[in-house]
């Protein structure tokens, strides 16, 4: 099976993401590495739709911060009213100045549209004064072909976390047109046991969701939580 491999493992790092259904030992994870590649960042599900709150988020976020992780929260978007979803997310994420904020834009039974995704991210931007990143894969690659130029410009100004279970990220839409980004901020290369190794880390069971940041842990820390909104 293929695996990620780098000549200088100090110049890349991993970011793990999970929700309450994923068993995780944060103390073990804080000490883990894979072939000398460290995992300094974690992104945890916080909310979904207009009212759901992940029951593990608050406890894990507090523990992770105490262990020195870079911490981020994500909201799983649905077709419900955007303003209500943004309020649900910000109320329960309770972001500090160092909490990363992300929208999970992917297929589900109550599908969020691209316009709603942009509106959600903008609402988070305006409420926090910094940018909300977007996580997606084929959902965005399909939706983006109908985007307006202003929507593409908006997305290009926000960090992209790509789900693409492969060694190298493919940065084109379903029509093979370049996405608004040249490279992703994060590349989720494995999940649910699919994609290149590693599929687990100490403290995270096999089938973990892991993403690659092409930069050192220090560079990831400097870029975290994400840039402020341009004035």
Annotate the PLM regions.
Residues 1-36, 151-231:
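Functionally critical loop-and-helix segments that line ligand-binding/catalytic clefts
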Residues 29, 64, 103, 124, ...:
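Conserved, mostly hydrophobic/aromatic
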Residues 44-50, 67, 79-83, 105-107, ...:
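Cell-envelope and extracellular/periplasmic
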Residues 100-176:
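Catalytic domains of cell-wall/extracellular-matrix polysaccharide-remodeling enzymes
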């Amino acid at each position: 099976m293929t695996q990620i491999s780098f000549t200088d493992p100090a110049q890349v790092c991993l970011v793990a993401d999970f929700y309450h259904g994923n068993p995780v030992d944060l103390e073990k994870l804080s000490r883990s590495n894979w072939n000398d590649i460290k995992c300094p960042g974690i992104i945890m599900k916080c909310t979904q739709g207009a009212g759901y709150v992940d029951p593990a988020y608050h406890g894990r976020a507090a523990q992770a911060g105490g262990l020195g992780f870079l911490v981020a929260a994500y909201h799983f978007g649905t077709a419900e009213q955007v303003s209500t979803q943004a309020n649900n997310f910000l109320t329960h994420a309770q972001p500090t100045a160092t909490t990363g904020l992300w929208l999970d834009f992917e297929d589900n039974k109550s599908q969020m549209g691209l316009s709603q995704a942009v509106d959600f991210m903008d609402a988070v931007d305006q409420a926090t004064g910094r940018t909300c990143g977007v996580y997606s894969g084929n959902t965005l690659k399909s939706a983006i072909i109908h985007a307006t130029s202003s929507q593409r410009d908006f997305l290009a100004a926000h960090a992209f976390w790509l789900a693409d279970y492969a060694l190298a990220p493919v940065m084109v839409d379903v029509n093979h047109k370049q996405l608004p980004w040249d490279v992703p901020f994060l590349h989720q290369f494995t999940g649910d046991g699919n994609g290149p190794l590693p599929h687990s880390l100490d403290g995270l069971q096999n089938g973990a969701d892991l993403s690659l940041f092409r930069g050192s842990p220090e560079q990831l820390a400097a870029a975290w939580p994400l840039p402020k909104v341009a004035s």
